[in-house]
Amino acid sequence: HLPFPDGAADILLDCFSPLAIDEFRRVLKPGGYFLYVVPGARHLWELKQILYDAPYPNEEKETPYEGFAYTDIVPVDFPLHLERQADIQSLFRMTPYCWKTPKSGVERLETLETLDCQASFRVHIFQKL
């Protein structure tokens, strides 16, 4: 339960979290927006290639939600250049890969001194009807 009254919000942002679509419907004003940020197909692809023997791209899909118009998908892509093992580990620890990577992948990652990879996001924009 979001701590806002019904119809109080003009805009909501959900970044890499499960959607609380019923709560979004409740707290958004008519005509209000919610932005749903998800990883793009090749988000952190170079990192995944180090961690996994057979990495796969993230699924990209358009999912309609009742009571909302799907207005746009905005791609946000940019390179990351990490120059220290500590920074590589910080990136790794903030991903779900940290919890499911095989030991061999973690060991490969620990040998790197630098890492160049691509961040890739998709911002799905919805407007409440």
Residue ranges and their predicted role:
Residues 19-35:
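A short glycine-rich, Lys/Arg-flanked "PGG" loop and its adjoining helix->strand segment in the class I
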